[in-house]
Amino acid sequence: MLAKRIIPCLDVDNGRVVKGVQFLDIRDAGDPVEVARRYNEQGADEITFLDITATHHGRDTTYRTVERMAETVFVPLTVGGGVRKVEDIRALLNAGADKVSINSAAVFNPEFVQEASQHFGAQCIVVAIDAKKTGDNKWEIFTHGGRKPTGIDAIEWAVKMADYGAGELLITSMDADGTKAGYDIALMRAINDRVTIPTIASGGVGNLQHLADGILQGGADAVLAASIFHFGQYTIPEAKQYLAEQGIEMRL
């Protein structure tokens, strides 16, 4: 059995972390490189960097930030946000990203995922799925940060993306996100019952048991969280220890 992974997530706008970070020993909590360095030292298995900068001009800042991060951090780095074409992926990989996350662009052009996977290999292509519950065991894909409904069934979409060459799925419940009430376990379970590629649970973590639930009940291969780590509520080692005590294989 492969060890499960803990992935802190940074939301970055114009080269600055936007969901506040409270580490006592960080000089500049707004600098994503400082924050990533801290998580690297704590033993994060991977780090995810979501660029929410809308502007074209902001992309250059992003590439520079990724370059600086890759020099500082020695765990796999996934970068997402605004990835629309093969050139974007190439630029991020060249800057030092290990994996690239594709979200809205996959919805508008599913063949892009096939093309990306063939070009660079499935191992570095993550498809991010933002899903909202619309009924009993039914979820719909939303784009534009969860604002735009697409009418696409999230479970069928996950299967399609796996078929199209995604190496991994990052599954965020728009309902759970920010609630601190735990992942949408039913959503994770429904997708994991249908796909064989690794999945990452995202959205809703408020405590360490939620991380365990994502793995033990949801079937996730990795668990992503932001605020519980950013605000110093828990450290990565505490989270790993807790999961290991639940019988989950971790890299301690």
UniProtKB/Swiss-Prot annotation:
Alphabetical list of Pfam families matching this protein: His_biosynth
Cell compartments where the protein resides: Cytoplasm
A GO term for molecular function: lyase activity
Enzyme Commission designation: 4.3.2.10
Alphabetically ordered keywords of this record: Amino-acid biosynthesis, Cytoplasm, Histidine biosynthesis, Lyase
Assigned protein family: Belongs to the HisA/HisF family.
Protein name: Imidazole glycerol phosphate synthase subunit HisF
Lineage summary: Bacteria, Pseudomonadati, Pseudomonadota, Gammaproteobacteria, Moraxellales
